[in-house]
């Protein structure tokens, strides 16, 4: 198990982004610095080490791998994209950690866990995706009693109401400036940043 946050970030630096990202799925890689900080904090709160951690919409696996490096007993990453899952499996082999990656729609995932740590689509690109992160949150709370989930900061007020409606409580918040590199043809800038919040949500 890694004992310094800096070492965790260094271990995650070489996790690659998706080779052929689909704009509808908003397949942005969580930066190593943010992934390390969040999973380090989750571990400090007793939500990772020795537990089963699930990553819904795992992409190439950076959050799953971070949980495995921080001593999770079992890690499961789920993503509908087969290319992303294959890359995640390769990264687990490279880092010599145990993690199980499934090519599956998250809505069809039936297992239970102790903690979900996920970065779902922000719903920032298309109107049809604007409910995506909220659907992920509803699913996550069926999988585990504790959820860490990335969302656009501007949706925070709505999410507070949603969490309450789901009979759950926001116990911690982590704020990040999330860099979005120019990976899609419609992007005008080389890189832009969006303000995100990670909610720690606990089922009542």
Question: Model segments located where?
Answer:
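Conserved SAM-binding loop
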Residues: 88
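Conserved SAM-binding motif I beta-strand of class I
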Residues: 74-79
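Conserved SAM-binding strand-loop segment of SAM-dependent methyltransferases
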Residues: 96-106
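Conserved SAM-binding loop of SAM-dependent methyltransferases across substrates and taxa
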Residues: 60-72
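Conserved glycine-centered beta->alpha loop in an early N-terminal alpha/beta scaffold
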Residues: 57
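Conserved short alpha-helix immediately C-terminal to the canonical SAM/SAH-binding motif I
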Residues: 83-84
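S-adenosyl-L-methionine
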Residues: 1-54, 65
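S-adenosylmethionine
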Residues: 104-197
């Amino acid at each position: 198990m890694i004992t310094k946050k800096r070492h965790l970030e260094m271990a995650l630096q070489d996790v690659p982004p998706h080779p052929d990202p689909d704009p509808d799925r908003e397949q942005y890689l969580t930066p190593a610095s943010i992934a390390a900080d969040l999973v380090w904090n989750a571990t400090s709160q007793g939500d990772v080490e020795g537990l089963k951690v699930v990553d819904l919409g795992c992409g190439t696996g950076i959050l799953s791998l971070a949980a495995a490096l921080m001593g999770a007993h079992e890690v499961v990453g789920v993503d509908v994209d087969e290319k992303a899952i294959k890359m995640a499996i390769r990264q687990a082999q490279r880092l010599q950690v145990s993690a199980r990656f499934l090519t599956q729609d998250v809505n069809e995932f039936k297992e239970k866990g102790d903690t979900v740590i996920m970065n779902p689509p922000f719903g920032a690109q298309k109107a049809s995706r604007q409910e995506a992160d909220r659907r992920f949150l509803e699913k996550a709370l069926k999988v585990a009693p504790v959820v860490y989930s990335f969302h656009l900061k501007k949706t925070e007020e709505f999410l507070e109401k949603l969490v309450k409606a789901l009979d759950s409580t926001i116990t911690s918040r982590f704020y990040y400036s999330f860099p979005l590199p120019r990976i899609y043809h419609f992007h005008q800038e080389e890189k832009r940043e969006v303000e995100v919040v990670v909610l720690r949500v606990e089922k009542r």
